[in-house]
């Protein structure tokens, strides 16, 4: 009897060969020779489901660690793929598991350096934080490449440009932490069962933490305040931090009008604001 997807786990299984190939290609998986160690990519897959994408990843010859929450699916995956030497299946919640600790006994699968996954859409935000960290606390060490199949709305927000409807704090945060590339659109019919939303494949290339510019704590604070109320102008959202007339002067230095809203500032302008703001504040 066929295994029926469970709604509570947000299960929609990808069965569209062109999309599967696009995901694997976007990861640019380097196989190298087994004895070369560091030249081989070690892959993390979140929510392998029925193992369709997993099999394509395993076909590269690279070590693949798959994390699956559904116990029944784990049983099926072990029967189907459990004999592969380059496959390690971990049962549990990826948001809770300590992967570093679990992989200490499996050195051939560690350290994981790339993520390739069709993630459950209902936990996209916490998974992004797990994989990238936050502005104040980026993930260290970071992954080299993260290829995710996500809801199209999320892809639009992650890649959005200033002064657009989709642009918000999430856009700035993710673009600060990583380069974000839109790979391909994915229609509902590519899944079983078809979701009620469109999807897209994105690739995140995290920046090394030592290359992240600016005062990360202040940038995070400004984003929280600035986007707290999208309808308000920055001079109102930030008035608890800086006097409106001072902010107007500061915005002029950024070639922005005094009526600017948070959504009008590019990542570069947010960083400029972060760098200039301390010169307008009284000494502490």
From Swiss-Prot:
Q: Which PROSITE patterns match?
A: RRNA_A_DIMETH, SAM_RNA_A_N6_MT
What name does UniProt use for this protein?
Answer: Ribosomal RNA small subunit methyltransferase A
Q: What is the lineage of its organism?
A: Bacteria, Bacillati, Cyanobacteriota, Cyanophyceae, Synechococcales
* Family the entry assigns: Belongs to the class I-like SAM-binding methyltransferase superfamily. rRNA adenine N(6)-methyltransferase family. RsmA subfamily.
By its UniProt entry, which InterPro entries does this protein fall under? KsgA/Erm, rRNA_Ade_diMease-like_C, rRNA_Ade_Mease_Trfase_CS, rRNA_Ade_methylase_Trfase_N, rRNA_adenine_dimethylase, SAM-dependent_MTases_sf
User: What is the annotated role of this protein in its UniProt record?
Assistant: Specifically dimethylates two adjacent adenosines (A1518 and A1519) in the loop of a conserved hairpin near the 3'-end of 16S rRNA in the 30S particle. May play a critical role in biogenesis of 30S subunits.
The keyword rRNA-binding is annotated on this UniProt entry: no
In the record, biological process GO terms are: rRNA methylation
- Which Gene3D superfamilies does this UniProt record tie to the protein? Ribosomal RNA adenine dimethylase-like, domain 2 (1.10.8.100), Vaccinia Virus protein VP39 (3.40.50.150)
Q: Which Pfam families match?
A: RrnaAD (PF00398)
Organism of origin: Synechocystis sp. (strain ATCC 27184 / PCC 6803 / Kazusa)
**Record's keyword terms, sorted:** Cytoplasm, Methyltransferase, RNA-binding, rRNA processing, S-adenosyl-L-methionine, Transferase
């Amino acid at each position: 009897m066929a295994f029926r997807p469970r709604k509570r786990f947000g299960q929609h299984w990808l069965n569209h060969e062109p999309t599967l190939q696009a995901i694997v290609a976007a990861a640019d998986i380097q196989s190298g020779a087994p004895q070369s160690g560091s030249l081989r990519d070690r892959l993390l897959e979140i929510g392998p489901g029925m193992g369709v994408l997993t099999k394509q990843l395993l076909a590269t010859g690279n070590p693949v660690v798959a994390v699956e929450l559904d116990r029944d699916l784990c049983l099926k995956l072990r029967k189907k793929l459990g004999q592969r030497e380059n496959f390690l299946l971990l049962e549990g919640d990826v948001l809770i598991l300590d992967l570093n600790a679990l992989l200490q006994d499996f050195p051939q699968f560690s350290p994981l350096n790339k993520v390739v996954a069709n993630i459950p859409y209902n936990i996209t935000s916490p998974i992004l934080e797990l994989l990238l960290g936050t502005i104040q606390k980026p993930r260290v060490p970071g992954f080299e490449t993260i290829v995710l199949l996500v809801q199209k709305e999320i892809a639009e927000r992650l890649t959005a440009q200033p002064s657009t409807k989709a642009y918000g704090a999430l856009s700035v945060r993710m673009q600060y932490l990583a380069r974000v590339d839109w790979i391909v659109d994915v229609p509902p019919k590519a899944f079983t069962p078809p979701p009620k939303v469109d999807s897209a494949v994105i690739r995140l290339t995290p920046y090394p933490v030592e290359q992240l510019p600016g005062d990360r704590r202040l940038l995070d604070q400004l984003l929280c305040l600035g986007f707290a109320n999208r309808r308000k102008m920055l001079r109102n959202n930030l008035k608890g931090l800086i006097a409106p007339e001072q902010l107007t002067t500061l915005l002029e230095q950024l070639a922005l009008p005094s009526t600017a809203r948070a959504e009008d500032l590019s990542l570069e302008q947010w960083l400029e604001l972060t760098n200039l703001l301390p010169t307008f504040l009284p000494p502490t």
